[in-house]
Amino acid sequence: MNFAFGAAFISAKVGVGEFPPFLFTAMRFLIIALLLIPFLKIHHGQMINILIISFLGGGIHFSFFYLALDNSKYISSVAIVLQLGVPFATILSVIFLNEVIRWRRVLGILFAFSGVIILIFEPTVFNDLGGVYYALLAAFSMSVSLLFMKKLNDVKVFDLQAW
C-alpha cells in the first residue's frame, strides 16, 4: 500500500511536468469516471452531501494537490504537508461534530503541526512555499470532505468514488 501511494506522488509529479495541473486533474477524473460508471448510483436524500464530497475531496483536493506538485521542486515537502489532513479533520470534527479528543491526540496534533513548521523553515523547502501552501489547501479541502462523509449512510466506497 505504501508503495502504491508513493508511486502515485511520483507519477503525479511527472504528469504535472507534462500537462498543466488543471488539465491533468480533468484527465485523471475522466479516466476514473469511465472506469467507475457502473458504480454510479443515485442515493436519495444524500446526494447533496455526495456532491459536496466529490467537489471538495475530488476536484478541489486534486487541483490543489497537482498545483502543489507543479509549484514544488521536491515531492517530499508536498507529501509531508498533505499528512496534515488527519489533524485538520480531527480539529474540524471537534468543532463541528462535537467529538471529544483526549490529551494524547492533542499532543499528536501539536507534533504534526510542529513537524510541518520545522519542515517549512528548511532552506530547500523555504524556496518551495507556493507548493506548501497549495498542499495545505489540498489537505484542508479533503478534511472538510471527510466531515460530510461522516453523514453518509449505506453508500459503498465505489459508489462514492464514482461521484
Predicted regions and their residues:
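Membrane-interface helix caps and helix-loop-helix hairpins in membrane proteins
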Residues: 16, 67-73, 121-130, 151
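Transmembrane alpha-helical segments that form core, pore/gating elements
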Residues: 32-36, 89-91, 127-163
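Specific transmembrane alpha-helical segments of multi-pass solute transporters/efflux pumps
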Residues: 3-9, 37-82, 87-90, 118
